[in-house]
Amino acid sequence: MSIKYSNKINKIRTFALSLVFIGLFIAYLGVFFRENIIIMTTFMMVGFLAVIASTVVYFWIGMLSTKTVQIICPSCDKPTKMLGRVDACMHCNQPLTMDRNLEGKEFDEKYNKKSYKS
């Protein structure tokens, strides 16, 4: 069974989307505590803060996405954005690298860490 690679930008966007749904779920839980206004307000505020946090994450990844390197994937011939030394295609999840020293090596996200020496 092969390893499923995923693009870093898509991972962060998925995290932000999950924050939206988690925030709405937490705020909805506050409805069940209508008789205790403090608990209800706390749940709704925590849910609201999770939705605001997702907005911040979406803004951050949008700004980061404008600074990334755009390349053409050799497998699907579609443009994709690459963060770091190794990443995966946004469309076909093909492992990609722009570092000549890593060509032909097994895909590993540890190559993106500053402490890793090739």
Swiss-Prot record:
Q: Which Pfam families match?
A: DUF2614
Keyword tags: Cell membrane, Membrane, Transmembrane, Transmembrane helix
Q: What subcellular compartments does it reside in?
A: Cell membrane
Bilayer topology reads: Multi-pass membrane protein
Q: Which GO terms describe its cellular component?
A: plasma membrane
User: Which InterPro entries is this protein grouped with?
Assistant: UPF0295 (IPR020912)
TM spans, by residue? Answer: 12-32, 43-63
Q: Which HAMAP family match?
A: UPF0295
Which family, according to UniProt? Belongs to the UPF0295 family.
**Name this polypeptide is given:** UPF0295 protein BCAH187_A0594
